[in-house]
Amino acid sequence: MSTVRKLNESALRGIYDAYMHEAFPPAELKPLAVMLRLMERGRYLCYGYYRNGRLAAYAFFYRHDSRVLLLDYFAVTPELRGRGVGSAFLAALDAVLGGVCILGEVEMPDSHDAGLNAMRLRRIAFYERAGFSLSLIHI
């Protein structure tokens, strides 16, 4: 049984401490205090994807307004990566969020490191398979 749950501050703290340092490079990880402040102000929405009562994946969004969310962090727990959990979670989130525009950002595959470029291309392909469209905006 799989469910999507909106997360509270306590759950955000737990995920941050248990999973996020492994899943994201230090330079990309916001301080927990910043996320909590945004959540208190209603500008940060956090969701967990649970399978059989255990966390399988999580997604954190910055809320621009009632119709637009920026996907800030998205990850599957290490033991479940590569098993379709991320795709299932995105589909379930789409149903829960009901027509909200979700924006995501990915790094372009323009590094001098071939391995890094391969990972970036896999990430882009994953989001495209999930229904995201690649824009021509480069920042």
Where are these regions (language model features)?
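A short, internal acetyl-CoA/4′-phosphopantetheine-binding micro-motif in the GNAT/acyltransferase core
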Residues: 74-81, 108-109
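Conserved GNAT acetyl-CoA-binding A-motif
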Residues: 97-115, 119
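Conserved beta-strand in the GNAT
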Residues: 48, 54-62, 68-75
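Conserved small/polar residues in nucleotide/adenosyl-binding loops
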Residues: 137-139
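Conserved acetyl-CoA-binding loop of GNAT-fold acetyltransferases
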Residues: 123, 128-134
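A short helix-loop-beta-strand connector motif used in the catalytic cores of GNAT acetyltransferases and
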Residues: 38-48
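Conserved acetyl-CoA-binding loop-helix of GNAT-fold acetyltransferases
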Residues: 82-96
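Short amphipathic alpha-helix that is part of the acyltransferase structural core
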Residues: 1-34
